[in-house]
């Protein structure tokens, strides 16, 4: 018998469709996020990226098709994701204003601390040992992401780029085998995006626990620099899939971003469009 995978979850979507009344948001979408790989999902405004992310997170049920995790049927439920080894970051950082940075990160691990920080938050009996362990782990993640100096600060006092890293640390403390990133470059400067790319590239092989990554993003340069494979959506359908080089050279991708009347050799723009 083969050993269980230790380098990430194998996520697959087969012929997924989503309809909102007469509107087709996703149409026959199939993709795979193999263990330990970074797969990007891009597309122009209205392509269906956000809907796809919401399907995987369990916020939107598919009208047709199926999902699997490690080859087993998967029906996403938002409240069950962490138990399945899945963590996510959202477009907004969503930090708790009444907690310090390190406490925000600790809150991301409450599903695994049976009598720890979560209990302390809600006035329930707790284990001091669990809380000390979580705090130590949270501080380590903040150091890994270069923001340990802000551990005691309230989130509202920090630059947006720092808060984005705190949100990433909060996802990582759950030790996910699959990490879902929803437009992590949104609102960041060019320098911040470059640094973010370096962080994301290292995540599948990090010492603290490897993971697979699905990156939904509109910033073309980031996607091209960090992803092993890219899936391109347009009007809810997959129009291209492959390596960054294959996608960059695909005429359908160029047409989707720039229109039909484009010069030969034109490439999609860096920032791209929204969801």
Question: What residues fall within each predicted segment?
Answer:
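The feature captures the beta-strand-to-loop junction immediately N-terminal to the Walker
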Residues: 42-44
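Helix-to-loop junction immediately C-terminal to a conserved catalytic motif
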Residues: 57
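ABC ATPase NBD Q-loop/coupling interface
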Residues: 66-84, 122-127, 156
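Hydrophobic anchor residue at the start of the ABC signature
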Residues: 168
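Conserved catalytic motifs of ABC-family nucleotide-binding domains
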Residues: 175
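Catalytic Walker B motif of ABC-type/P-loop ATPase nucleotide-binding domains
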Residues: 179-183
């Amino acid at each position: 018998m083969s050993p269980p995978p230790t380098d990430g979850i194998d996520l697959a979507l087969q012929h997924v469709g989503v309809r909102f009344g007469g509107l087709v948001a996703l149409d026959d979408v199939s993709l795979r996020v193999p263990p330990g790989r970074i797969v990007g999902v891009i597309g122009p405004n209205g392509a269906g990226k956000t809907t796809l992310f919401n399907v995987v997170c369990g916020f939107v049920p598919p009208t047709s098709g199926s999902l699997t995790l490690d080859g087993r049927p998967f029906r996403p439920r938002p409240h069950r994701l962490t138990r399945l080894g899945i963590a996510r970051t959202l477009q907004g950082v969503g930090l708790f204003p009444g907690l310090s940075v390190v406490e925000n990160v600790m809150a991301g691990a409450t599903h695994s601390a049976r009598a720890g920080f979560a209990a302390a938050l809600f006035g329930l009996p707790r284990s001091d040992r669990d809380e000390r362990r979580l705090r130590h782990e949270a501080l380590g993640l903040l150091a890994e992401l270069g923001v340990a100096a802000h551990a005691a600060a309230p989130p509202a006092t920090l630059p947006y780029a720092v808060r984005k890293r705190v949100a990433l640390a909060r996802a990582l403390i759950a030790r996910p085998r699959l990490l879902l990133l929803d437009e992590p470059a949104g609102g960041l400067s060019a320098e911040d995006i470059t640094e973010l790319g370096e962080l994301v590239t290292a995540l599948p092989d990090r010492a603290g626990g490897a993971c697979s990554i699905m990156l939904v993003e509109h910033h073309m340069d980031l996607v091209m620099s960090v992803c092993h494979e890219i899936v391109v959506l347009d009007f809810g359908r997959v129009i291209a899939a492959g390596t960054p080089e294959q996608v960059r050279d695909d005429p359908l991708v160029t047409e989707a971003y720039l229109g039909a009347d484009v010069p030969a050799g034109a490439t999609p723009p860096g920032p791209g469009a929204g969801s």
